[in-house]
């Protein structure tokens, strides 16, 4: 039976296609917008049955041209939190997604989509409750608004609807994202280029490099998506993080030590990395004061209650794995 992945040439989408392939699923239709042509690299080692542009796909799917479709993994969206064109953002992230969900409901197709932790904005609590959702930008609002529609539709939905609020995802196939790529990716390239990693210094009551995020490997993101794919009776909106915040220091130290090990050098402690100038702290930029979250940590109790019990990779495990993947491809 056919499976469709939108945003298939993107970061999470291409990892999902690969994850489906690893389970023997090759009847996968990839949907994307290849205006940024370099994204095609993410699909070179994937098996797909067809490729469609996102604009052509929506109407064709609504007409039922693909026959019985088991599931749609909707990862396609504008994920640039700095985008200020609200009309474009709402059309692309909200209206398109709404139309796709309606078609899935009409056809009895599982609908698994990407929401975002940006729905929480400045909240200090990261739990899937309306009272904690305070998006700070139009990207977050586009995801927030669609989640509200989903909540209204869930009681009457006859097929699966699952939204995943991704936290800070890192891992293979994100190179095309540029400045929106993960901290791990940027730390890796910065150290290879300059021999040092720079992090923000003291700010918000946090010591240098101790501002923290809920960093999650794309490997775990794929596993959770496939878990719900295997359990079409489970619907809802779920946080998708590890449930454990880790400081930026952990990312930087793991990146540097993994690169050192690849060169046959010993691992160093955080203090030693700082003493040797391999990790530097810079003054917190004035432009970000009052606009920067120093701490995010997902509440994954709802995800666990829904039956997902697998452990999540720590930064030390996941980022090291990712760095080795990058090293292999850097030559």
UniProtKB/Swiss-Prot annotation:
Active-site residues per Swiss-Prot or TrEMBL entry: 139, 177
Cofactor note: Binds 1 NADP(+) per subunit.
Coiled coil ranges: none
Domain of life, source organism: Bacteria
UniProt keyword Isomerase, yes or no: yes
InterPro entries documented for this protein: Epimerase_deHydtase, Heptose_epim, NAD(P)-bd_dom_sf
Cofactor(s) needed for function: NADP(+)
Transmembrane segments: none
Molecular-function annotations in GO: ADP-glyceromanno-heptose 6-epimerase activity; NADP binding
EC number of this enzyme: 5.1.3.20
Entry keyword set: Carbohydrate metabolism, Isomerase, NADP
A single GO BP: carbohydrate metabolic process
Enzyme class at the top of the EC tree: isomerase
Pathway the protein contributes to: Nucleotide-sugar biosynthesis; ADP-L-glycero-beta-D-manno-heptose biosynthesis; ADP-L-glycero-beta-D-manno-heptose from D-glycero-beta-D-manno-heptose 7-phosphate: step 4/4
Catalytic activity line of the entry: ADP-D-glycero-beta-D-manno-heptose = ADP-L-glycero-beta-D-manno-heptose
Binding site for substrate: 168, 179, 186, 200-203, 213, 292
Entry binding sites for NADP(+): 11-12, 32-33, 39, 54, 75-79, 92, 143, 169, 177
Annotated domain remarks: Contains a large N-terminal NADP-binding domain, and a smaller C-terminal substrate-binding domain.
Stated role: Catalyzes the interconversion between ADP-D-glycero-beta-D-manno-heptose and ADP-L-glycero-beta-D-manno-heptose via an epimerization at carbon 6 of the heptose.
PANTHER family per record: ADP-L-GLYCERO-D-MANNO-HEPTOSE-6-EPIMERASE, NUCLEOSIDE-DIPHOSPHATE-SUGAR EPIMERASE
Family per record: Belongs to the NAD(P)-dependent epimerase/dehydratase family. HldD subfamily.
Quaternary structure note: Homopentamer.
Name of the protein this chain belongs to: ADP-L-glycero-D-manno-heptose-6-epimerase
């Amino acid at each position: 039976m056919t499976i469709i992945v939108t945003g298939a040439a993107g970061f999470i989408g291409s990892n999902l296609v690969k994850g489906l392939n690893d389970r023997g699923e090759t009847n996968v239709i990839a949907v994307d917008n290849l205006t940024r042509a370099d994204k095609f690299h993410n699909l070179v080692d994937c098996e797909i049955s067809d490729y469609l542009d996102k604009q052509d796909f929506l109407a064709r799917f609504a007409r039922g041209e693909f026959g019985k479709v088991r599931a749609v993994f909707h990862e396609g969206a504008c994920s640039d939190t700095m985008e200020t064109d609200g009309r474009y953002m709402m059309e692309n992230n909200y209206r398109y997604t709404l139309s796709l969900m309606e078609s899935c409901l009409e056809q009895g197709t599982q609908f698994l989509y990407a929401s975002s932790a940006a729905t929480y904005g400045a909240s200090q609590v990261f739990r899937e409750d309306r009272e904690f959702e305070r998006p700070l930008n139009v990207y977050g609002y586009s995801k927030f608004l669609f989640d509200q529609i989903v909540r209204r539709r869930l009681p009457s939905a006859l097929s699966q609807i699952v939204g995943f609020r991704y936290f800070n995802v890192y891992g293979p196939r994100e190179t095309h994202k540029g400045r929106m790529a993960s901290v791990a990716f940027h730390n890796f390239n910065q150290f290879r280029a300059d021999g040092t990693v720079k992090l923000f210094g003291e700010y918000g009551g946090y010591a240098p490099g101790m501002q923290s995020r809920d960093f999650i490997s794309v490997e775990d993101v794929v596993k959770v998506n496939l878990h719900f794919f295997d359990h079409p009776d489970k619907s809802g909106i779920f946080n998708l993080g590890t449930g454990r915040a880790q400081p930026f220091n952990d990312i930087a130290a793991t990146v540097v030590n993994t690169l050192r090990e690849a060169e046959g050098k010993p691992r160093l402690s955080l203090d030693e990395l700082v003493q040797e100038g391999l990790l530097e702290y810079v003054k917190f930029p004035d432009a970000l004061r009052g606009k920067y979250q120093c701490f995010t940590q997902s509440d994954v109790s709802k995800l666990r209650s829904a039956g997902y019990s697998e452990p999540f990779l720590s930064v030390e495990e996941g980022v090291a794995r990712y760095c080795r993947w990058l090293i292999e491809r850097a030559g």
